[in-house]
Amino acid sequence: MALTGFLHGHAAWAASFQFRDFRLLWGSTLLQSLGMGMEHVALGWLVLELTDSPFMVGLASAARMAPFFFLGILSGAVADRVDRRVFLRFLASGAAVIAVLMAALLVTDVARVWHVMALAVAMGCIWAFTMTLRQAYTYDVVGPEYALNGLALNSLSQRVGGVAGALMAGAIIATLGVGAQYLAVSASYLAGGLVLLAVRGVGRAAATEHQPVLRSVVGYVQLIKGNHTLMILMLLAAATEVFGFTHQSLLPVFARDELHVGAVGLGVMSAVRQGGGILGLLLLASLGDFRRKGQVMFAAAVAFGLGLMVFSVATNIFVFVLVLALVNASASVADTLYKTLMQRNVPNEQRGRAMGSWVLSIGTAPAGHIGIGAVAGTLGAPAALLINGGILTFIGVTTALGLPRIRRLS
């Protein structure tokens, strides 16, 4: 009975599961996130083994995220023009093909760093569109009343898949190699796409636009310029991405050079990172459509920064993973509130563009990955996280005090 109630959204924190198409979307996201979790671990470890350079690890993460910045505006414009269900299926197939190509290069032992970088960029292009359309389609399916719950549960599925994927990645890399790892990544992406075939409705999406893409892009720029709330949320999300989320690119360095736990340890660390996010998302989902979202958003961002600073004194694996879990609980809360408030502060027909704004914000990550990699290569990984955490904390405190209108958003 408890399981039935959960699947049909009778529990408060699982309210969005009452919608059939949301349950399918959640399952698809879970499967694709399994692949993404494996891919994140594999990419960092592969580049570190090929180059022995923390900077190159950061550069690889930057290559993976660069398309988010350059395609953020375009993805938002496209999201408001297409059937989001159909396009999500197409994107899942594309991700599976790219993972197979990477596996083929590794299995045949011809992979070079430039191959890895090029395919990382290609995968980033796929995910720039996937993230935009998935967030907008989640809102379509559950509607504004359950938007926060739906987005939190969708992020939860990403985290759960990421935990399982990270643990699997460490074991597969250690036993079968990175080539086999990318075959598993491809299978996960393909399975997620197949689940989407069962999704039926368009939800509460506005009528699909038929104006030229260029005109949609121009309208998007005008939206950002005219909607100050959206612009501020974009900038806050970008700052959190550059100085906060980029900590994950240093996990391979901590695993191998600071904590000496190897590929299996890296998998565990990545799983704990995702697990912390799960705790934060469960808390957020259980709160329902609460007021004072802006205050909670700022508090989570500040906690994120303070947690990163603690990494500089984490000298053993147990302290490290505990802090890692708490940091990512805060990170997941802040990120989900950014997405929710962006969509709640634009008209229905522009929510695709709003999520394109979020993708554009997280597309600033390459600057952060390159920067944190350079600092880590010069001063060490702990110092790099101390600096980034201090900057993020400062931004969170000053903007919370200086932007009362954003702080009062609900």
Indicate where each model-derived feature is located:
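C-terminal transmembrane bundle of multi-pass solute transporters/carriers
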Residues: 69-74, 81, 85-97, 101, ...
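Structural signature of transmembrane alpha-helices in multi-pass secondary transporters
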Residues: 32, 64, 154-158, 273, ...
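Short hydrophobic/alpha-helical segments at membrane-entry points of transmembrane helices
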Residues: 25, 111-119, 233, 318-324
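Core transmembrane helices of Major Facilitator Superfamily
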Residues: 36, 122-134, 327-338
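Hydrophobic alpha-helical transmembrane segments
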Residues: 113-124, 149-204, 269-271, 372, ...
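Helix-loop boundary and gating motifs at the non-cytosolic
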Residues: 6-66, 226-273
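Cytoplasm-facing, short amphipathic helices at loop-to-helix transitions on the intracellular side
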Residues: 22, 84, 135, 146-148, ...
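Flexible cytoplasmic inter-helical loops of multi-pass small-molecule transporters
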Residues: 2-6, 198-219
